[in-house]
């Protein structure tokens, strides 16, 4: 998928407002799903165990190597016109909206009627809210879980960055094979979120312009306050806020700085919004061992892949055309 196609996908994503069938079809059509996805790994105890068990773990954005991952900003100043629109609703007698605001006032430690009356009759001081929303930035990154892939197993940038300078390996997943995605096929899957809510995989968009995540930050700020209170009476408000943030997780997760565009990344995004790490079970169709992987680690990779039931175990080499290629491994 080239950069122009990624931009077209992004333009569709940022203009979605619901998750009905028509919206999903538009997004699927724009994403141009590849036939295969690749996952680059260094050699470690964890990566070998996950290879052996056909597991891929989601990671939160605050643990990624790029400190600018989830390339967004929070603009509290833009809340002023939103605030004015809220005042307008109150002055026009929208009682349902007023009740929601009273619930929000309780969450923020303010007297509900005073809050609503102040909102109706005059300006508010946004300084405190600005400080709190700025702190939400790290909380947002902790809530965004994804697994990173690319299309090309010979991507030189990723062999350097994520496979320890050609000393690791790459797992290749055939998306056309029904046996690739294993979640939901075992007894242990009955209560697993990955089996009940199958994650979607989307292309990453690269840009020098950050995404405006102010709405999402405000929503997360409210939801965190509701969760801390653990009050069932506020459950409907929690769901109301959560639904209002539809597609915001995808928009924030799928934008990175332009300088990373050679990664040509795809991301599997976990649909639920909780700070709990989970995994999916996916069986690679092929594993390629790195060009500089030490002999004893080559044996460990081949052994783990064999236990996982992976038939094609290959090694990376440079062919006669001076390009990266792969061939069956010799141990």
Feature map (PLM): residue ranges:
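Partner-binding and oligomerization surfaces adjacent to conserved cores of proteins
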Residues: 1-331
